[in-house]
A protein has these predicted regions:
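Active-site-adjacent betaalpha module
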Residues: 2-27, 54, 61, 73-192
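Short hydrophobic beta-strand that contains or immediately precedes a catalytic carboxylate
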Residues: 29-31
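A cross-domain feature marking catalytic cores of carbohydrate-active enzymes
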Residues: 33, 68-71, 145
């Protein structure tokens, strides 16, 4: 097989920004941090899981709504560091967009949630598609770049680029732009 002469240039991304979130109207969503994915993806367990775990502890302490999404067969295989607690929302999804054919939107709106923090595997898949579904439904979205990764640097950058440039584009990464997505980092997220 011959090599392609095509060389792709990575799109540039703005720096992650600090955000201050109201715990009463914010939900932390965690996608696919399960045994078989983590076993195949070292970056998942080594970098992403510790970031999610630390954010999850702070979110629980602040009273943030917590929701989990994965396929039905995987619901019992969450890594212990980020596993669901009693009362957390659990969505058995059928597609990358966690809103597609699920009751996630109803569950969040019943709790008065307006802002979502999207975390988990993977930024170019579930997180990107759910960010589109969320902004179409009127949510403001925060994506902490250390808490949602992918198999390659290319997929990470493309996922983040798509998140900022979908629907209500936020190409400059304006913090908490309404009905759009913001790139942040777990240490830049404050609950107040």
């Amino acid at each position: 097989m011959s090599k392609s002469p095509l060389t792709l240039q990575m799109p540039s991304l703005p720096d992650p920004v600090p955000v201050v979130l109201n715990p009463a109207t914010t939900a932390l969503l965690i996608f696919d941090v399960i045994d078989h994915i983590s076993a195949r993806q070292p970056i998942c367990k080594e970098k992403m899981v510790p970031a999610i775990s630390q954010l999850l502890v702070r979110a629980r302490k602040a009273g943030v709504t917590i929701a989990y999404g994965t396929r039905a067969a995987n619901m019992s295989t969450w890594l212990p560091e980020v596993s669901p607690a009693s009362g957390d929302i659990k969505i058995e999804n059928h597609a990358q967009d966690r809103f597609y054919h699920t009751d996630l939107d109803n569950a969040l709106k019943a709790k008065g949630i307006t802002t979502l923090i999207l975390t988990g595997w993977k930024v170019s898949g579930s997180v990107t598609y759910t960010s589109v579904g969320a902004t179409l439904r009127g949510y403001t979205v925060v994506v902490p770049i250390d808490a949602t990764l992918d198999a390659t640097e290319y997929e990470i950058v493309i996922g983040q680029f798509q998140i900022l440039h979908q629907n209500s584009s936020n190409a400059t990464n304006e913090p908490l732009k309404t009905r759009a997505s913001t790139l942040s980092r777990t240490d830049l997220i404050t609950f107040k």
